[in-house]
Amino acid sequence: MTADDYGRTLPFFTVNLLVSDLARSIAFYTNVIGATLTYSDPDFAALRLRELEFMLHADHTYDHHPWFQSLTSGVRRGLGAELRLFHTDPDALEARARKHGATILQECKDMPHGWRDVIVADPDGYTWAIGSATKPIT
């Protein structure tokens, strides 16, 4: 599929993360988060996680963008945004994160908002909260 054909297939909402090492990020998202890689080249990767289609772009693809200097300065990325996955076993995800050496920001625990979650960071510092309901919704 060409890039412009792919762009026309995107849903109403999707996520695009700019990453410093595309291969390392693909490994994190497939091995730890459980996404399926649907396409990749040296600049770009498309992944699917259930209904979510999301993208990774290598930093160098933004070399003419106003963000480029900030991207390559080593500043932590994604600060202030938390991506959440619900209906996902947080204990199993934490085990995969440990197995693959991923950064665990918060170990699994039951939260006051009604779900058990784990919080992990991808290799570039993007934060993911993954969990499931602690009891059935009534």
Label for each model-derived stretch:
Residues 18, 23-38:
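N-terminal first-folded block
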Residues 1-16, 36-88, 92-121, 132-138:
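Vicinal oxygen chelate
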